[in-house]
Structures are given as C-alpha cells and as structure tokens.
C-alpha cells in the first residue's frame, strides 16, 4: 500500500525546527516515520494515487510499524480514532486531538485529507500500575502504558521526551513480540546465546548480555552497561552507569556518569558524575560534571555547566508550561526543562520545572557575591598584612 505525508508547518519552542527534524532515538521523526512505513510494507510517495486506497499521515505524528499494520487490517476508510481511556489520559496532554491522531486511510482517488469519518483502532495496550518509590512523590507516579501499537503527535517539547520514551518501550516490546512469535528452536537458541554471553543467570548479567554495541567502542572494565544500544566509537569511562539507554555514534560518557532510560545523541557528552534520567540529549549536547537532570531535553550543541540545576518535581499542582503562546497545564507533576540549541547555562543557574530556554541563550547566575579582586583594607573583609592575618571587623549598620 502507498502512503502520503502531508505537511503541518509545525514548529515549537525552544527548538523551532521543522517538526520532521525532531530527534527520535538516533534519527529524526521523518526518518522514524519512513522506517515504520517500510517495516509495515508501505511505500512513501509524493502524491496521492488515483487507482488504489492509500494511507495519509501528518509530518508531526510518530507511530510504530505494528500500529500501521493494525490500521491497514481494519480494511475501512477514515481517520483513526482511539478510545483507550488510559492512553488518552496519560498521552493526551498538549496534543490537539489525541483521540484522533493524524493518520487516515483513504479511498482511491480521494484527495489527501485528514478529515473524514472515524476509523476505530484498538491499540491493545497494557497499563502496569506505578511503582511508588517514596510516599513523598507518590502523587507524581503514573501508570506505565506499554504495547507495540503506539502513536503520538509531536507538538510540544515535552512530547520529544514522551515519544522517545515510547520509542524505547516499543523497541523492547517489539523484540519481545518477535521472540514469542518465533519457533521454539529459534527461541531456545536465542536463550542459549544470551546465557553464554552472560555466563550467569543473574538479572544484571543477563541485562549486560542484551547490549548491542557498535564498532570501535571503548568501555572501561568498571563501567556498568545494561540493556543498552551503543553506536560506533562510543566511550564509557570508569564506574559509569548506563541502563536502558540508546547512545549515538561518538558519544562520551565520562567517569562516574549515570544515565537511565535516556537517549544520548551522536557526539553528545555526559560529564563526570553527571546524572540523566528519562532525558534526551540532541547531538553535540554537553551536560557537564555533577548535577542531576530528569525529564529534560538538551538541544543540539547545548552546554550546561557544573552546578546548574533544574527542578523536575512539583509538590503542589500540575506543572505549567508555555504552549502556543499561553501558559497551560502539562497535566503532570514530573517534568524538567528544555535547553535550546547552542544555549549555554552557566554555573549555579537554577531553572524551574517546565521552563524552556531559547536557542542560543546564555544564562549566568547572579554575580553580586563573586570576588573579582583582592580587597584592600575594606572593613568587614578578611585581609593579610605583612604575613599576618588581620581579624575581620563586623560592618557597622548604616545610620
């Protein structure tokens, strides 16, 4: 079946890229769409066919191959409609019409349009209950929705996070489904191969055996890398920790750095002792030493200095963000910040949750207490005279 992509003209701050250039795993949204279409047996064409039914979709919607197969199997005509309440509640925020993703099947000769009757599609999702790690943030825990039939619009920077996390889930779910559908002998050989690589039945050893590592990678013997996909020429330093991550070509994970369930782009760098969870680093981004970052997006060639901080958890109401020029609820209590392309964040800068730093911005912390020269006989300041410390004299209050 043929497929036609229609342009939405969508951009969103802080990145302002054409939406098709949004980073999804190791490529772009446009590339992810094309890969899913190919895997599902669709051929992307420039104009609508006149002699056969076809698929039409927006350039701002992400989907899996399993979702496309499900749509085609309906045999109907119309725009996809989803009725799963859990999916709409968890994935709906900041989407224009989450119940009607911008994907449709059209009859032969019909003009490429996303208008039309509803075409019900069952995503067959599973919702695992949230794991409450601590009562203090039980209010922020959300159920994990999993499956292989996934679709999501990309209209806000928070969607970059959500879609990348969904893509990670879909990658694991599709591998699991492929394994379960294979013949018994093939599954047995696969299990034996994993156990031989793991040399153990312990979960951590098996997780290491599931890694996919490109050529030219350097992984220090003390580093822990589990259930990850590493591109070519990736460096992982001493005592670094990577769990459930996709890492692009030439990325560098320095000593004691920690990343979990994150996407680290080509040439990106995670500095010593830095921590990133549930985050996306565009190619060339550099998160410097120290500090913890969760649910954040770092733009292309962005730089974040040591001791910069972003809040990510609201203990009050849902976090509010800017969307289409208005401040609205993101309908979540757990969300970090977005750092624009080439933006620079200096030491000690503190950013509130939901904040978006524009492209090319340069933020520095207040510098009123920065010592710029040695004080000379200023009352209240410590000094040294002839090698002898002069006691500090308390400043007198102003009259």
Each language-model region and where it sits:
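Activation segment
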Residues: 65-66, 229, 246, 263, ...
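Surface-exposed, flexible loop/turn segments at secondary-structure boundaries
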Residues: 11, 62, 225, 242, ...
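Glycine-rich hexapeptide-repeat left-handed beta-helix
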Residues: 256, 271-399
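Acidic, glycine-rich loop-and-beta core segments that form the ion-binding/anion-interacting portion
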Residues: 216-275
């Amino acid at each position: 079946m043929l497929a036609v992509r229609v342009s939405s003209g969508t951009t969103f701050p802080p990145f302002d890229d054409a939406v098709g250039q949004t980073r999804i795993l190791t490529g772009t949204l446009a590339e992810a769409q094309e890969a899913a279409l190919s895997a599902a047996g669709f051929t992307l064409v420039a104009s609508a066919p006149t002699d056969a039914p076809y698929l039409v979709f927006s350039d701002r919607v992400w989907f899996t191959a399993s979702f496309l197969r499900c749509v085609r199997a309906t045999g109907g005509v119309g725009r996809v409609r989803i009725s799963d309440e859990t999916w709409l509640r968890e994935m709906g925020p900041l989407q224009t019409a989450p119940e009607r993703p911008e994907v449709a099947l059209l009859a032969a000769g019909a003009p490429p349009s996303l208008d039309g009757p509803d075409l019900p599609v069952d995503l067959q999702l599973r919702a695992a209950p949230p794991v409450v790690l601590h009562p203090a943030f039980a209010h922020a825990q959300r159920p994990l929705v999993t499956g292989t039939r996934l679709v999501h619009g990309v209209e806000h920077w928070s969607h970059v996070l959500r879609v990348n996390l969904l893509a990670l889930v879909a990658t694991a779910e599709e591998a699991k489904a492929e394994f379960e559908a294979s013949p018994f002998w093939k599954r047995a050989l696969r299990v034996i191969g994993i156990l031989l690589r793991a040399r153990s039945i312990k979960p951590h050893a098996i997780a290491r055996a599931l890694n996919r590592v490109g050529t030219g990678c350097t992984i220090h013997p003390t580093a822990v890398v589990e259930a990850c996909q590493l591109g070519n020429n990736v460096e992982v330093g001493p005592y670094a920790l990577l769990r459930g991550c996709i890492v692009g070509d030439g990325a560098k994970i320095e000593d004691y750095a920690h990343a979990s369930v994150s996407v680290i782009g080509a040439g990106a760098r995670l500095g010593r002792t830095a921590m990133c969870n549930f985050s996306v680093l565009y190619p060339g981004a550099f998160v410097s030493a120290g500090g913890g970052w969760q649910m954040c997006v770092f733009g292309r060639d962005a730089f974040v200095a040591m001791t910069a901080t972003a809040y990510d958890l609201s203990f009050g109401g849902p976090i509010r963000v800017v969307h289409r020029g208005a401040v609205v609820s993101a309908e979540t209590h757990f969300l970090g910040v977005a750092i624009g392309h080439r933006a620079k964040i200096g030491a000690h800068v503190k950013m509130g949750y939901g904040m978006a730093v524009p492209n090319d911005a340069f933020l520095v912390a207040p510098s009123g207490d920065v010592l710029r020269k040695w004080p000379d006989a200023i009352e209240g300041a410590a000094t040294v005279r002839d090698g002898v410390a002069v006691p500090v004299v308390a400043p007198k209050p102003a009259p």
